[in-house]
């Protein structure tokens, strides 16, 4: 691999974190595009970005390794003064989303949720191949989820188990700031990092190239 093609993903030093080692030759920090850096840092002067950045840092610091993600979402929501929480949920995780909504309501939040099958539109109506109806005839509709939550004027949206790609469309169309409570993985109990933890053992098949 050419040095100019290498990036943070190829680094095991992490000197940018604790500053107690030496940067690798290809480090993005030591080869930084100053124009891009300045553009990024300038964005933190925008009121919402500054508020969110400070709130996120405080949530991380105040209960580091003490609060679950559900608790951190509530901590964050309070710090940005979010009163109305939107939940964009997979229909298969509606039970878990109801539990999340109950918790949020007990902590004083208003909750409005939309499941992925709302509107009951057929998959074939948007050009999805008919064979995909083998796992259900109605399409997941993340754009509708986003637009209904936009209409409800939520302050913060929370994604619960939307499919790969459907989550991308939801993030694209959501007007409110969005965070994720659950990342879907039907095989690993919605814990996709388990495949990475076991990539040298049980899931070593993931490292095989398509040619193998």
Predicted regions and their residues:
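C-terminal functional extensions of proteins
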Residues: 179-212
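Short, surface-exposed connector motifs at secondary-structure boundaries
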Residues: 79-86, 148-155
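A short, acidic, amphipathic alpha-helical segment used as a generic capping/interface helix at domain edges
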Residues: 139-154, 162-166
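Short, acidic/small-residue loops that bind anionic groups at enzyme active sites
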Residues: 110-117, 169, 173-191
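Electropositive, gly/pro-rich neighborhoods at or near active sites that engage anionic ligands
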Residues: 2-84, 91-95
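Long, charge-dense
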Residues: 95-145
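Short Gly/Thr/Asp-enriched flexible loops that form oxyanion-binding sites at enzyme active sites
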Residues: 96-103, 167-176
């Amino acid at each position: 691999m050419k040095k100019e093609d290498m990036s943070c993903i190829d680094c095991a030093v992490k000197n940018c974190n604790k500053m107690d080692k030496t940067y690798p030759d290809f480090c993005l920090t030591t080869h930084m595009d100053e124009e891009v850096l300045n553009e990024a840092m300038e964005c933190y002067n925008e009121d919402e970005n500054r508020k969110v950045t400070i709130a996120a840092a405080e949530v991380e610091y105040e209960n580091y390794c003490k609060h679950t993600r559900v608790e951190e979402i509530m901590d964050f929501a309070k710090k940005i003064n979010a009163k109305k929480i939107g939940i964009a949920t997979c229909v298969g995780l509606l039970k878990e989303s109801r539990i999340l909504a109950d918790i949020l309501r007990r902590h004083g939040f208003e909750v409005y949720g939309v499941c992925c099958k709302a509107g009951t539109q057929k998959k074939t109506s948007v050009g999805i191949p008919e064979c995909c109806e083998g796992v259900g005839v109605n399409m997941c509709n993340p754009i509708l989820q986003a637009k209904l939550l936009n209409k409800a004027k939520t302050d913060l949206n929370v994604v619960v188990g939307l499919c790969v790609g459907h989550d991308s469309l939801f993030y694209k169309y959501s007007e409110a700031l969005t965070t994720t409570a659950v990342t879907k993985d039907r095989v690993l109990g919605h814990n996709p990092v388990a495949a990475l933890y076991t990539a040298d053992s049980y899931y070593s098949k993931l490292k095989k190239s398509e040619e193998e």
